[in-house]
Structures are given as C-alpha cells and as structure tokens.
C-alpha cells in the first residue's frame, strides 16, 4: 500500500528524532504548534536551542528536500519559536529533561534553524540523512 505524504513525513520525523538522539540531542518537543504554524522537532545540545525542519523524499520528482524550506517556512518557524520561548523560557533558561524524569534548567547560548533531509528508497529504506545546520544563513 502506498503511503500518503503525511505518513511519509511522520516516518521521516521518527527517523530524524532517532538520528538526533544518537548524537546526544535532547528532544524538547515534536510537532510544536502555535498560531497555526508548526516546528517538527525542537532540540537542545551544548547550549544550542535548535528548531528542526524535517523534509523526507522517496523520489526526486520535487527536487532536494531542503528546496521546500523557503523564507515563508522560516518565518513560520520563527513565529512558533517565539511562542515556545515565551511559554518555556525562564531567566534565559529552558527546562531540559534527562533520564528518570530529571528536569534541569539549561542556559540558551545560541538558537538556530536546521534542516534534516531524509532520502528514502521506494520501499521505505533509509538511503541518506543530511543534517544542514544554520539553514537561514544558506538561503
């Protein structure tokens, strides 16, 4: 059975989350919604608060996955990011959860927007994962 774009997107986000956790990212939120906008994954590592846009492709018909992350999408992510910070930041820190439910407020030294491109084979196998840091600077 052929998967819908929404199913492929959710599968890609699952892959991205596992990829990030293996690289010691703390996942603060998935599919964070605010003002009708969404951030796929919000993560924290080594003082960097990162808003991840995950793009998954199973063919090359629409170009590279990152081609879909334009100025409008960046603007939407910024809108959500402001809401996230207004909701969770206290005294320049955000709560980061560790194993056994331990919450430690962590300082934010930098924020950025990254894109994670996921390329799948037609049968859904992972072909490639490409983590593009500081996507805004590449537009």
What annotation goes with each model-predicted range?
Residues 1-31:
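Acidic-basic catalytic patches of nuclease active cores, encompassing PD-(D/E)XK
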Residues 56-122:
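Catalytic cores of nucleic-acid endonucleases
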Residues 32-34, 56:
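Short, glycine/acidic-enriched loop or turn micro-motifs at the edges of active sites
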Residues 35, 46-48, 123:
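Short strand-connecting beta-turns/loops that link adjacent beta-strands
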Residues 20, 41-61, 77:
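Conserved catalytic cores of phosphodiester-cleaving nucleases, focusing on short active-site segments
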Residues 112, 117-139:
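Short, low-complexity, polybasic intrinsically disordered segments
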């Amino acid at each position: 059975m052929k998967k819908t774009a929404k199913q492929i997107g959710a599968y890609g986000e699952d892959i991205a989350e596992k990829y990030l956790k293996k690289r010691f990212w703390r996942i603060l939120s998935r599919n964070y919604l605010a003002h009708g906008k969404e951030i796929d994954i919000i993560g924290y590592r080594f003082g960097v608060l990162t808003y991840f846009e995950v793009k998954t492709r199973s063919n090359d018909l629409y170009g590279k996955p990152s081609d879909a992350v334009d100025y409008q999408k960046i603007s939407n992510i910024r809108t959500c990011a402001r809401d996230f910070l207004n909701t969770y930041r206290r005294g320049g820190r955000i709560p980061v959860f560790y194993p056994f439910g331990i919450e430690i407020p962590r300082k934010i030294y930098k924020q950025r927007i990254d894109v994670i491109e996921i390329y799948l084979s037609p049968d859904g196998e992972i072909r490639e994962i490409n983590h593009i840091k500081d996507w805004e600077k590449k537009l």
